[in-house]
């Protein structure tokens, strides 16, 4: 029978190993998934999302590594999750994220996780709907939590949360969050963690006989939360926070006082609240500051707990201020959204070879969605990939004749021709298409005036490029006829009040149609001009406009070649148009006041895809005058535009996009004052001839412009007020929206300059005092019944909303994209969304939105700051609310782009302060709910700032303050990743680009989770470049072996970079940590180098920063001492040359050793005629490597000097003799004697002098000539080079060390990622010293015995890999079983690590130690310090995560490690410390990569705190039954 047991266990273990699942990349599975494969390991950076798998039964070990995730979710109302791990031989270990989410299910959920042990240092979420009672239990025998556990229900039911094996114990040092849940205590509670009751939650201490640690905390967060304690037990005191505002604390019996004591009492001096039932009482430490009169007795009748009448106490006042313990400060995060729970679609490319042997490329559109029953399905549509080009040519001839009636019958004629030529761009996915639109517009303007003049204007020619890019894919289709008609009429009246009057009535109407093409285009241009000419000279204005046009429609179409009349439900076109035109009006040969106003409007219509579009407006302004005149011009313009389109296919989406950027140059040299008031009302009606619903949109524009110009000798003031109002009407039943626009622009024009030339050309500089802004407010009410619609949208910036959407760009350059599906979403940066509208559903929503965004400006000087604020709020049905507050402080002439990504229940605040001439790109990305982030940015002038602030999986909020210098590119990216401590980062800067950083890391409890703050280098470019700079910044973060607080400063020097042909530049900075609070830490300095790679791309449009970091222990850098010679006399000539370089010794870069060279050349003193012997001595100070001012050239903190003797010679007859005479100088620099401070690199170094010939001055009148040449080299101590350096023994803070030579490392130190990688080395297998069999007790009932053996593979390269086999023997009723587990060391490393002295233990040498990963250094006690890498215990009670070595023979008594007994008769202790890399004691330490260390204790039956015999009997019974069944 015993053999059978061993055989079964062996087979089970082998099956578990063979069928293990390793997840190394992101994976999504939908539907039924079998998890009965054995061990499941999810590696860092990977995630596994399982969706709608009803039963998930883990039969092996579950191990989720740091930075990895496991999601099991249900999206069905009828399918609830059943997740279990019932085996008693395996464990659960989570360092990442585990989420079980069944909140949408209407049936009960069950989460039953048992196992041998449970350890959580990451985040675990258990969520259910709460409509019916659900089961949530974690009942492992060994139970430890140092991370976050969240138990969530939508509403409270009678279900309870059970933690730990009944009557056992749990250790909670993290936080346990309850939301609408009841926790019922069934075990002892150890540790100093926190239980948080959120919403309608209750903490029920059901058995006070199972003690609760006095350091455990209970936090009542909301007014409906409560805490109940069993009354029949010994009296205990519970730490309760947040009591007040109506929540409750009670007992399981009614509160009844005795003769001298009331039912409840509060001690205001101690903060203790006592509740009594006769002689039974319990105490609660609620804190100070409560008013005894506000306590009252109530009944807690919540479900899932005993409802005791008058058994609880409530406090009606607010909660007094009280600091929360650290464990309660960890945030209770919302349930994370699992990848893949929402329908998605994407495209894929398939390449195959057909029967003819040709390669065919096909494109597949893959859609993953659910049907009406909730089942997932995948649809793939395959169609050929088309590679075509689109060429569009538009030629417009504009003829303008102005008949001017004058007293002398002089006729002025103005003509112009404008050509528009378009060019293809990138790879458009249309079929080859060419369309030509020819149009001739004629305009006759009769002008009557009393002034005699004659003028003729030459042709004005402008070119614009029409650029089109599209993401639409379609096959060739034939449209027989397309009819488009568009008429435009304009009535214009002008009234000029001046010395002469003129009335101008102009009527312009044009129409044209184009057919016979898939994409016919129609162009309408309207040009009106009013002029009153009286001038002898002229100035011109060049107006350049850039217009981006975007058209997007959605389509789900049938694809057929050469199909006639194909009906499309949706179509998708992305059209981007950019045009640049320059209008110029030449000098007039007449005198007077001239005002010429030109307006043109172009409309492009794409016919076959039913889309509205779009307007391009260009304007030209010409002002010229030579006399002082006041002119008032008032113009009223009313226009009505109607457009009818005949479209064969219905259109379900419309997009209206406007984007205009204009630049105006005004040249004036006279004094004039004019006032221009223009009012324009436009009504545009578009009526597509389809059966689909139309839409109605009202858009109001209001613009006010004020301009001021001043010249040295004249004064000119122009006041223009333009008010325009236009409406775009598209009729839709029961749906309307209004979008008012309001724009205000004020500009100041600087003094002009007058030239004496006959045709003066003047130039003016524009100073923008206040930027313009745009406001859009929308209020929409939509009631509609819509059938099922699927739309795929691709756009730069657009919004999808049930009620309409509002996206506002600046008034000078703006784009609007509108689309109305049924769900509201916000996308940007070419996002793809798939809104779904259920059939025959009724949606009602109301939305009010206001968005204010500043405009684009350009300036040469800075001005005062103007504040803007904006608020965006949207509410759709029962969806979570989105809120974002942005406050911008921006002066004029700045380019500000703000992008906000919103997800449910997020909040973000950003405050920006930017001077003039700056480009600020701010992106706030909140990835997870319930997080807050505040950022303050202040930037001097002429700076480009890219700031990205995000909170990803963070447990705490962060505050950042950043200021950057002028003319610099600063990139800063800060994330707080799974940290248990708050972080504060402050960046300060001046014009020297000095960045100081202060970081405090309190609890670096998890080595795999790095909290990194990186300050990148400053970038300065004086010349414009077209390169994309990828800045790779590596910064060393110091983590000594005993880490308490870490503070360091960073100093960065801006470097000016000219355009380089190679495009590669390097910048360096140094970082110097401040003194640490730990006595075992030494001050040190690190240096970092940033490399900038140049790529052919626009600098401003695409740049990103990638920051990497490495952990390092005490890091030293080399610095070079410099020499200086004192002046001999005022007549002496001296030249001092000191050159030095610092290089990073932390291994961040693979650089050659830097050589610090300093040379001093001294010219001799001029002597007249005498025999003299001259001796010159130089004295200098050395530099300590831990100097806090390492970035400066100061040489400080080295108080030793050296003297250089100068050899002299007799009279020199010729210059040749000078070369034959040399000298050698020798110096020695000793230690500074400052305790544990790092010493200078030049220590006990006998340097050498290189004798070089030195040219001398004319010595014809001197009897002696002296030449001094002193040159020496100091080698760098970087261990990655073959540096030769010796150091002196020294003592620092009680830490003894001997002289050590720096090593030459032939391989790089393994990084954190390398540690997590398993290496398989080939080599000889040698058995190590072996493990000593440890038999703690005889094979009695409930006893365990463990024995182990180990061996090592030594590869030819010198690395080792260790194996260990552990055999665990368990006995029950004299029947024993064995469990054999084999472990393999996961790191292959070079054995170059040296140990250090550790005086924490004195004991004998343990001969059974496993071969260490480093050299065995005998300590003072004679004990071998062994860094074992064999965690062969199967039961884990983590005692510490620090580096621990196990000392002492296990047969000794009273030995312990980190407070855990190792030599007790009832436990078995193991400790391990995997250590890799290289380390040298002494001055120059290498980087040490230390893996996680653990202490293991297996408890046995020998005391009330261990596993009871009853449980072991039950365990044995279950095993016996399983054996019998097998």
Swiss-Prot record:
Effect of disrupting the coding gene: Leads to decreased adherence of germ tubes to plastic and epithelial cells, but not endothelial cells.
Membrane-topology descriptor: Lipid-anchor; GPI-anchor
Stretches with biased composition (Polar residues): 525-541, 1193-1207
Locations listed in the record: Secreted, Cell wall; Membrane
Glycosylation site list: 93, 498, 637, 1451, 1463, 1479, 1502, 1506
GO terms for biological process, alphabetical: cell-substrate adhesion
Lipidated residue numbers (GPI-anchor amidated asparagine): 1502
UniProt keyword Secreted present: yes
PTM entry text: The GPI-anchor is attached to the protein in the endoplasmic reticulum and serves to target the protein to the cell surface. There, the glucosamine-inositol phospholipid moiety is cleaved off and the GPI-$modified mannoprotein is covalently attached via its lipidless GPI glycan remnant to the 1,6-beta-glucan of the outer cell wall layer.
UniProt record similarity statement: Belongs to the HYR1/IFF family.
Role played: GPI-anchored cell wall protein involved in cell wall organization, hyphal growth, as well as in host-fungal interaction and virulence. Plays a role in adherence to plastic and to host epithelial cells. Promotes the tissue fungal burden during murine vaginal candidiasis. Also increases susceptibility to neutrophil-mediated killing. Furthermore, contributes to the severity of hematogenously disseminated candidiasis in normal mice, but not in neutropenic mice.
The protein's name: Cell wall protein IFF4
Organism: Candida albicans (strain SC5314 / ATCC MYA-2876) (Yeast)
Gene responsible for this protein: IFF4
């Amino acid at each position: 029978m015993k053999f059978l047991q061993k055989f079964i266990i062996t087979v089970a273990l082998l099956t578990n190993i063979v069928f293990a699942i390793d997840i190394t990349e992101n994976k999504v599975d939908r539907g039924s998934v079998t998890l009965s494969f054995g061990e499941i390991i999810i590696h860092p950076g990977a995630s596994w999302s399982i969706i709608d798998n009803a039963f998930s039964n883990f039969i092996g070990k579950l191990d989720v590594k740091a930075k990895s995730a496991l999601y099991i979710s249900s999206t069905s109302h009828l399918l609830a999750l059943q997740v279990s791990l019932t085996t008693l031989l395996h464990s659960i270990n989570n360092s990442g994220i585990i989420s079980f989410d069944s909140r949408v299910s209407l049936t009960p959920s069950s989460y039953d996780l048992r196992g041998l042990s449970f350890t959580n240092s990451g985040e675990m979420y258990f969520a259910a709907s709460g409509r019916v009672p659900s089961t949530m239990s974690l009942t492992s025998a060994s139970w430890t939590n140092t991370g976050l556990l969240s138990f969530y229900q939508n509403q409270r039911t009678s279900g309870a949360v059970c933690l730990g094996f009944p009557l056992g114990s749990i250790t909670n040092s993290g936080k346990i969050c309850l939301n609408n849940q009841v926790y019922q205590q069934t075990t002892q509670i150890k540790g100093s963690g926190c239980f948080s009751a959120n919403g309608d939650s209750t903490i029920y201490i059901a058995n006070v006989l199972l003690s609760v640690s006095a350091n455990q905390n209970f936090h009542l967060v909301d007014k409906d939360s409560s805490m109940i304690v069993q009354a029949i037990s010994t009296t205990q005191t519970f730490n309760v926070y947040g009591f007040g505002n109506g929540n409750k604390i009670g007992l399981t019996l009614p509160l009844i006082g005795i003769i001298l004591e009331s039912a409840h009492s509060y001690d205001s001096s101690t903060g203790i609240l006592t509740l009594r039932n006769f002689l039974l009482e319990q105490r609660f430490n609620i804190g100070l500051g409560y008013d005894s009169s506000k306590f009252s007795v109530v009944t807690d009748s919540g479900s899932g707990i005993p409802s005791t009448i008058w058994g609880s106490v409530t406090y009606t006042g607010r909660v007094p201020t009280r600091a929360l313990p650290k464990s309660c400060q960890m945030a209770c995060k919302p349930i994370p959204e699992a990848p893949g729970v929402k329908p998605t679609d994407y495209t894929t490319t398939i390449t195959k070879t057909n029967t003819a042997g040709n390669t065919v490329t096909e494109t597949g559109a893959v859609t993953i969605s659910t049907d009406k029953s909730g089942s997932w399905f995948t649809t793939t549509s395959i169609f050929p990939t088309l590679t075509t080009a689109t060429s569009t040519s538009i030629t417009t001839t504009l003829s303008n004749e102005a008949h001017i009636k004058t007293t002398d019958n002089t006729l002025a004629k103005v003509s112009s021709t404008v050509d528009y030529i378009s060019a293809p761009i990138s790879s458009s996915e249309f079929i080859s298409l060419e369309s030509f639109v020819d149009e001739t517009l004629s305009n006759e303007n009769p002008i009557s005036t009393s002034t005699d003049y004659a003028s003729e204007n030459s042709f004005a020619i402008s070119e614009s490029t029409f650029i089109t890019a599209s993401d639409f894919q379609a096959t060739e289709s034939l449209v027989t006829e397309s009819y488009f008609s568009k008429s435009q009429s304009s009535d214009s009246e002008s009234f000029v009040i001046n010395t002469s009057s003129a009335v101008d009535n102009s009527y312009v109407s044009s129409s044209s149609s184009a057919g016979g093409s898939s994409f016919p285009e129609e162009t309408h241009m309207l040009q009106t001009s009013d002029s009153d000419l009286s001038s002898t000279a002229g100035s011109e204005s060049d107006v350049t406009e850039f217009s981006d046009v975007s058209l997007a429609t959605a389509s789900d179409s049938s694809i057929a070649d050469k199909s006639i009349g194909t009906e499309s439900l949706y179509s998708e076109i992305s059209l981007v148009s950019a045009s640049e035109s320059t209008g110029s009006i030449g000098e007039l040969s007449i005198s007077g006041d001239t005002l010429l106003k030109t307006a043109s409007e172009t409309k492009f219509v794409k016919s076959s895809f039913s889309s509205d579009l779009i307007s391009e407006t260009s304007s030209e302004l010409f002002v010229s005058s030579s006399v002082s005149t006041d002119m008032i011009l008032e113009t009223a313009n009313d226009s009505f535009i109607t457009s009818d389109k005949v479209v064969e296919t219905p259109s379900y989406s419309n997009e209206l996009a406007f984007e205009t950027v204009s630049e105006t140059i005004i040249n004036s040299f006279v004094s004039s004052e004019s006032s221009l008031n223009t009012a324009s009302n436009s009504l545009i009606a578009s009526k597509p001839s389809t059966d689909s619903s139309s839409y109605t949109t009202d858009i109001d524009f209001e613009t006010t412009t004020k301009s001021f110009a001043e010249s040295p000798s004249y004064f000119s003031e122009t006041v223009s007020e333009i008010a325009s109002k236009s409406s775009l009407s598209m009729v839709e039943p029961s749906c309307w929206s209004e979008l008012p626009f309001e724009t205000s622009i004020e500009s100041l024009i600087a003094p002009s300059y007058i030239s004496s030339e006959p045709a003066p050309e003047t130039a003016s500089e524009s100073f923008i005092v206040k930027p313009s802004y745009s406001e859009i407010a929308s209020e929409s009410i939509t009631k509609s019944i819509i059938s099922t619609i699927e739309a795929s949208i691709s756009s730069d910036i657009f919004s999808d909303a049930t009620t309409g959407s509002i996206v506002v760009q600046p008034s000078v350059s703006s784009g609007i994209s509108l689309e109305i599906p049924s769900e509201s979403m916000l996308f940007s940066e070419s996002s793809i969304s798939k809104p779904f509208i259920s059939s025959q559903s009724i949606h009602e929503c109301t939305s009010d939105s206001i968005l204010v965004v500043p405009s684009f400006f350009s300036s040469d000087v800075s001005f005062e700051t103007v504040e803007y604020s904006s608020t965006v709020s949207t509410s759709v049905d029962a969806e979570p609310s989105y809120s974002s507050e942005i406050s911008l402080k921006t002066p004029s002439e700045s380019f500000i782009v703000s992008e906000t990504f919103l997800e449910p229940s997020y909040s973000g605040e950003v405050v920006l302060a930017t001077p003039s001439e700056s480009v600020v790109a701010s992106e706030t990305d909140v990835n997870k709910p319930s997080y807050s982030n505040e950022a303050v940015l202040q930037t001097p002038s002429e700076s480009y700032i890219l700031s990205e602030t995000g909170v990803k999986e963070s447990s705490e909020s962060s505050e950042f303050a950043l200021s950057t210098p002028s003319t610099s590119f600063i990139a800063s990216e800060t994330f707080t990743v799974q940290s248990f401590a708050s972080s504060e980062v402050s960046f300060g800067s001046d014009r020297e680009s000095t960045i100081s950083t202060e970081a405090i890391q309190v609890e670096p409890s998890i080595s795999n989770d790095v909290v990194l703050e990186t300050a990148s280098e400053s970038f300065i470019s004086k010349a414009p470049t077209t390169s994309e700079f990828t800045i790779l910044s590596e910064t060393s973060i110091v983590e000594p072996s005993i880490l308490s607080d870490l503070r360091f400063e960073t100093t960065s020097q801006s470097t000016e970079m000219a355009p380089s042909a190679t495009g590669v530049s390097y910048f360096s900075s140094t970082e110097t940590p401040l003194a640490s609070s730990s006595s075992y830490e030494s001050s040190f300095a690190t240096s970092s180098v940033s490399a900038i790679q140049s790529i052919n791309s626009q600098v401003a449009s695409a740049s990103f920063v990638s920051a990497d970091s490495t952990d390092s222990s005490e890091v030293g850098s080399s610095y070079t001492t410099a020499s200086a010679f004192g002046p001999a006399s005022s007549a002496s000539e001296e030249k001092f040359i000191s050159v030095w370089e610092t290089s990073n010794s932390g291994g961040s870069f693979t650089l050659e050793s830097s050589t610090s060279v300093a040379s001093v050349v001294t010219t001799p003193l001029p002597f007249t005629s005498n025999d003299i012997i001259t001796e010159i001595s130089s004295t200098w100070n050395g530099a300590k490597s831990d100097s806090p001012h390492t970035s400066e050239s100061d040489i400080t903190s080295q108080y030793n000097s050296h003297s250089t003797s100068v050899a002299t010679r007799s009279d020199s007859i010729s210059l040749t003799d000078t070369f034959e005479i040399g000298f050698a100088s020798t110096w020695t620099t000793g230690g500074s004697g400052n305790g544990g401070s790092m010493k200078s690199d030049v220590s006990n170094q006998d340097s050498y002098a290189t004798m070089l010939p030195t040219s001398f001055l004319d010595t014809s009148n001197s009897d002696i000539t002296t030449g001094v040449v002193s040159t020496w080299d100091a080698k760098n101590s970087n261990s990655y080079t073959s540096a030769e350096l010796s150091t002196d023994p020294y003592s620092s803070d009680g830490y003894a060390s001997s002289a050590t030579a720096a090593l030459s490392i032939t391989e790089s130190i393994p990084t954190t990622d390398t540690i997590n990688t398993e290496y398989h080395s080939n080599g000889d297998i040698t058995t190590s010293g072996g493990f000593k069999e440890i038999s703690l007790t005889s094979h009695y009932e409930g006893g365990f015995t463990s024995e182990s053996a180990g061996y090592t593979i030594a590869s030819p390269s010198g690395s080792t890999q260790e194996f260990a086999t552990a055999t665990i023997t368990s006995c029950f009723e004299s029947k024993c079983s064995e469990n054999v587990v084999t472990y393999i060391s996961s790191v292959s490393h070079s054995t170059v690590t040296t140990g250090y002295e550790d005086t924490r233990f004195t004991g004998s040498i343990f001969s059974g130690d496993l071969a260490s990963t480093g050299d065995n250094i005998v300590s003072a006690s004679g004990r071998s310090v062994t860094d074992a890498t064999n965690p062969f215990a199967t039961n884990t009670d983590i005692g510490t995560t620090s580096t621990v070595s196990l000392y002492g023979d296990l047969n000794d008594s009273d030995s312990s490690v980190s407070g855990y007994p190792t030599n007790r008769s009832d436990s078995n202790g193991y400790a391990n410390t995997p250590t890799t890399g290289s380390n040298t004691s002494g001055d120059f330490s290498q980087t040490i990569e230390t893996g996680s260390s653990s202490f293991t204790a297996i408890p046995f039956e020998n005391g009330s705190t261990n596993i009871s015999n009853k449980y072991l009997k039950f365990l044995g019974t279950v095993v016996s039954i399983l054996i019998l069944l097998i």
